[in-house]
């Protein structure tokens, strides 16, 4: 069984959507907030983290495309040994538009759990 030795994990909230906790920190991401560029930046960070033995990755649907970015990175690996944590109960609504009025919606109902976890 794979053992998680490193106590440090990597959360992808700031890399999975163009406007989140990364607003005002564009110097580390750059001005290009397109999905392709953000995916590329996310993959660069994941490459670095994996080389440093980070094996826990935190994603969520409310983190925009973080789940897709991580899964596309995992598919590129020859071998992946790690853990992925995700969450339910929040829905990302901004559709990659930083100017959107409402970016997320919280719904902790049983029907929403079924929708997100067991479609």
Please report, for each region that a protein language model flagged, where it lies by residue:
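A short acidic, helix-capping loop that chelates divalent metal ions and anchors anionic groups
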Residues: 17-20, 92-97
């Amino acid at each position: 069984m794979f053992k998680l030795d490193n106590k440090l994990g990597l959360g992808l909230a700031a890399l999975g959507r163009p406007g989140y906790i990364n607003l005002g920190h564009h110097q580390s991401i750059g001005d290009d907030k397109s999905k392709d560029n953000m995916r590329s930046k996310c993959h660069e960070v994941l490459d670095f983290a994996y080389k440093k033995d980070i094996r826990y990755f935190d994603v969520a649907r409310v983190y925009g495309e973080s789940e897709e970015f991580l899964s596309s990175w995992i598919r590129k690996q020859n071998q992946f040994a790690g853990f992925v944590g995700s969450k339910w109960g929040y829905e990302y609504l901004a559709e990659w538009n930083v100017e959107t009025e409402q970016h997320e919606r919280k719904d902790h109902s049983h029907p929403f759990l079924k929708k997100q976890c067991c479609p």
